[in-house]
């Protein structure tokens, strides 16, 4: 095919024949798309028993009516299943018995097949085996290898090749020669036998092959059905309305917020924990801007004021603690001195009482009245007059 060399994933190149019209495709996804568009025109929803015209309508129907965003399509009969387990049960039953099996089905397809087709219903899909699939993959690898002529250039022309291979190599191309060499290689045969011994069972091989080839996961999003919503009549039931958050609308209406400040106060500069902090009332708050108003700006400003008050209280508390430490130190020093004095004088002496001061006697001299004899006589008479009488 001309477009095989332009594929983005050359490792996925291969031949995927359609079991209905025998067309061959390079990718399994191309085969699946072909089967959905050419052979399966309508579906029947098993939940609500509605007829669905196409695959795109099936996806939108499951998304809108039943709120199902993921479903797994069988590439053999294009039935839709809710999970991989149901799909594998269906495929195992198709391989063993030729019947769909008892699995949960979301939608069944109605195929439109020509009269010349071999299989007229999805239940009559041709069975396959792991051995045939392995040989098919080996042939695909051989067909994709375009450099075999450069790897074995002499074997094609060697006369001894007839003894090695009983086939006629004269008319073989590089890819056909590689297929024949792989089929007759004893090392490859031993490797296949070892792989067959290590293979646990055919059921596991079939399930792995089914998971690699026959399951198609379909995810539906709003973007997938956007085109269909615009082109068709939309019922009120299927409209998805995206409401704008009320908080955003409130912010848009209240975008102009006036923040009151003290314009007349000078900037405040203080030191907290050995860090200089300069607070200016002219600077805008980082939590308030003209273009965007944060919902928690008021709470942030309240927290900042609370932190400022806490720092001031903390500074006062530190000063009080320092003063208390100084008082405690002085008390300890005085207590040490008292203990030392008690050790020196175990019995304290009573305090010394000084005598009361006496009347000062006048100094002898010519100006002293008591030195006069007349004055002395008057004093003696006064003393005798004031003396009490003695009773016999």
From Swiss-Prot:
Zn finger (C2H2-type) start-end: 16-39, 43-66, 72-95
Biased composition (Low complexity): 289-303
Region (Disordered): 106-130, 278-303
Molecular-function GO terms, alphabetical: DNA-binding transcription factor activity; DNA-binding transcription factor activity, RNA polymerase II-specific; sequence-specific DNA binding; zinc ion binding
UniProt-annotated location(s): Nucleus
Ranges of Polar residues composition bias in the record: 112-123
SUPFAM superfamilies recorded: beta-beta-alpha zinc fingers (SSF57667)
Top-level lineage group: Eukaryota
PROSITE patterns (alphabetical): ZINC_FINGER_C2H2_1 (PS00028), ZINC_FINGER_C2H2_2 (PS50157)
GO cellular component, one term: nucleus
Record's keyword terms, sorted: Metal-binding, Nucleus, Repeat, Transcription, Zinc, Zinc-finger
Principal location: nucleus
Biological process (GO), any one: cell migration
PANTHER family given in the database record: C2H2-TYPE DOMAIN-CONTAINING PROTEIN, ZINC FINGER PROTEIN
Function of the protein: Probable transcription factor that acts downstream of egl-15, to promote migration of the HSN motor neurons from the tail to the gonad primordium during HSN cell differentiation.
Protein name, UniProt field: Zinc finger protein ham-2
Species whose genome carries this gene: Caenorhabditis elegans
